[in-house]
Amino acid sequence: MLKWFIISCCLLTAISYSTYYLFTSNSWIKTVKTHTYSRFYQLIKENTKTQLDRLQEEAKLSGKSLIPPFINFDREYAIAPKYNISICRIKKSMSTLMSGVACVLYDTGKFMRNNRSILEVWSHRFCGEKNEYRRMNEVKWRMGDAHHTFKKIVVIRDPIARFISFFSNKCIFEAQKYPDRKQCYNCQGNVTCFLEKQYERFVQHSSDYSRIRPSYEDKHAAPLSWNCEFGKFLKDYKIIKLAVDPKDRKNGLANLMNVLKESNVPNSTLRFIEKSALEGETMHATYDSDAHDVVKKEIENDKKIREWLKRIYYLDFVIFDFDTTFINS
Ligand SMILES: *[C@@H]1O[C@H](CO)[C@@H](O)[C@H](O)[C@H]1NC(C)=O
Ligand SMILES: *[C@@H]1O[C@H](CO)[C@@H](O)[C@H](O)[C@H]1NC(C)=O
Ligand SMILES: *[C@@H]1O[C@H](CO)[C@@H](O)[C@H](O)[C@H]1NC(C)=O
Ligand SMILES: *[C@@H]1O[C@H](CO)[C@@H](O)[C@H](O)[C@H]1NC(C)=O
C-alpha cells in the first residue's frame, strides 16, 4: 500500500513539474515556430518594426517627427518574362537605365533591329506600355508559370545623393527653364523652403485622410520605402545599391550584371547593357553638375537643412542600411 502511495506521489510530482515547465517556459515553442520561414521573417519584420517605432518615438520627443515608412505611394514595374524578371523603378535612381534594361530584355531582337538606345528619354522609349504595369498583382499575372518564382529587382541609391540629384535637376535646372510651372513650390532654388513644404505634404500623404493629389515633386522626392510596394514585398527584392560617389558607379553596375547573369541573360546582351550604361554615365556627368555641387555644399554647410532631410529620409537609411554618419552630423 505504502509502495503504491509513493509511486503515485512520484508520478504526480513528475506530471505537475513537466506541465509547469511547459506552460511557464515557452522557449521551446518559439524554437519550433522559427523553423517555419514565414514566421521567421515575421519575427525579423517585428524586430525592424519595433526598431523603427522606437526611432519614431525618440524623434517625436525631440519635436522632430519622422515621416513614416512603407506608405504604398508610387509603383512602376517593367517586366521581362523571358528571364523571369520584374524591375521596379524608383525615380531618380537610375530609372531611365532600368526601363531601358527591361526593354532590351523584353524583346532583345526587336530592340537591336531597330537600333534603339537604352538611355532614350523616358517619354520616347521604345517599349512604352508594352511591358509596364502599376501593380504587383498584375505583374504576377503576366509572369505566367513563373508567378511564384520570378525575381524582383530594384536599384536604390543613397537618399541624400538621390535628393541632391532630384533638387538640382527638377528644382534648379527645370525650374529655371520653365518658370511658369512654378515647379518645386516656387521656392526658386531655396532648399530649406522646399523641404519645409515637402515635409508638410508627406505628413498629409501619410495620414489616412489625405485629400491631396500626389504632385510631380512628391513622386520624385518620396522616401524610398514609399515605392515598389515595399511594405509587402521588401524581403522578396534583390536590392542593387548604387554607390554615393558616381566614380564608384561601376560597382553598382557590376552587381546589376551579376543579378542579370543569374537570370541567364546572354553575355552579348549583358555587354550591350554595360556599354550603354557607362556611356550614359559620362553623358550625365557633365549635365547640371554645377547646380549639383552648389546643392551639395549647401547641405554640408547648413545643419537645419540636414535636420529636414533627416525627418524625411532617416528611416530609409535604417531600412536599407545606408551609412548614417553624414545625416547624423
Ligand atoms: C544606329 O544609330 C546610330 C546613332 O544613334 C547611328 O550612328 C548608326 O548609323 C545607326 N545604325 C543603323 C544601322 O541605322
Ligand atoms: C522561368 O520560370 C519558369 C517557371 O518557374 C521556368 O520553367 C523557366 O525555366 C524559368 N526561366 C528562366 C530563364 O529562368
Ligand atoms: C529660404 O527659405 C527659408 C524658409 O522659407 C527662409 O527662411 C530663408 O530666408 C530663405 N533664404 C533665402 C536666401 O531666401
Ligand atoms: C559568358 O562569359 C563568361 C565569363 O564572363 C564565360 O565563362 C561564359 O562561357 C560565357 N558564355 C558564353 C555563352 O559565351
Swiss-Prot record:
It is found in: Golgi apparatus membrane. One of its GO terms (molecular function) is chondroitin 4-sulfotransferase activity. Its main location: Golgi. It comes from the Eukaryota. It is a single-pass type II membrane protein. One of its GO terms (biological process) is chondroitin sulfate proteoglycan biosynthetic process. It catalyses: chondroitin beta-D-glucuronate + n 3'-phosphoadenylyl sulfate = chondroitin 4'-sulfate + n adenosine 3',5'-bisphosphate + n H(+). Its EC number is 2.8.2.5. Catalyzes the transfer of sulfate to position 4 of non-reducing N-acetylgalactosamine (GalNAc) residue of chondroitin. This is Carbohydrate sulfotransferase chst-1.
